[in-house]
């Protein structure tokens, strides 16, 4: 399954906006409150209302609320174009006094066989609460063996339900005697995907006593998954949930991670991630799940620098409140400093430090080399050492001082000749 485009009309802060999506990773970038998460909400709610039409999904349809309609307007409209089972679909969802859905093609001759297909396309949403463990609410559907289990609450604001993962794992172990090949494959898929993303974590397993939970070995020590850091737990929740659902949706695929199809919506993909992980998360996700399409929000210049131009959309607001989309921007391969300054409109340095750099440069422009050196020394003291900019300024001062000495020497020689 792959989303092609989304048009929002009178939805929250969007009077009219069209988003185009590419295969692989798509990033939505913008300041807080500009509407990045709203785009994901529009997608997950609209898709929840049409997935049961052409997939094995039996989950509850989500609703747009009256508060989602732009102030002063009578209704909102969400228009979607996507492809599933190699069939192009068009979907229009409106919400005024009630919901209305138009979905094409709508022939049962086309749709009924799709609902019973051996391989089911998914849409999975990950909210900013994905790393928060919870054990109280258990969805029994998630451990069932049918394909509809893959869709269970996939578009809700789920927390990390370790008990559900553990229950599903224990069910797979119980199936080893009945369908050894596929059950073993599914368990290996889950264990391998953890090590692929967190290579210091191995031997993922479920235990039923003294209570049902997930354990793994971290640097050789056995711990409960709840004891991982927020960043580790959030990443684990994402890849385990997606991998499990791909296994459930495609029970006959030998490698559901390689060949399973899904649209994956991730709010704040950089959530709790160390900068080193932010630098690698895009490549890891797209290589591990090559047939999945990702649509994610982020504030991280490191992640922006890993996404090629077709997949980057910057959302901004003009003074009159109208939302503007800048598409196909270049972020791939740029330094974080350039991304901060050129794409995110943010200074790459502390304001006081930058002001001191400006003072050094002003003294250089005025030819006040002694003053420039004094101000440079103040800068180095302020930063507790050198960086590239301080080294550049020092080199400029040295060069100008050398040039000044050479000019003075030539003037002396000219004076002696006279």
Model-derived features: positions:
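Coupling/switch segment of ABC-type P-loop NTPase heads
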Residues: 96-195, 340, 355, 361
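Conserved P-loop NTP-binding catalytic core
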Residues: 29, 41-100, 104
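Switch/communication elements of ASCE P-loop NTPase nucleotide-binding domains
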Residues: 1-54, 215-348
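A general structural signal for short secondary-structure junctions and capping/turn motifs
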Residues: 68-72, 110-121, 228, 304
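Extended helical coiled-coil dimerization/tether regions that scaffold
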Residues: 149-259, 372
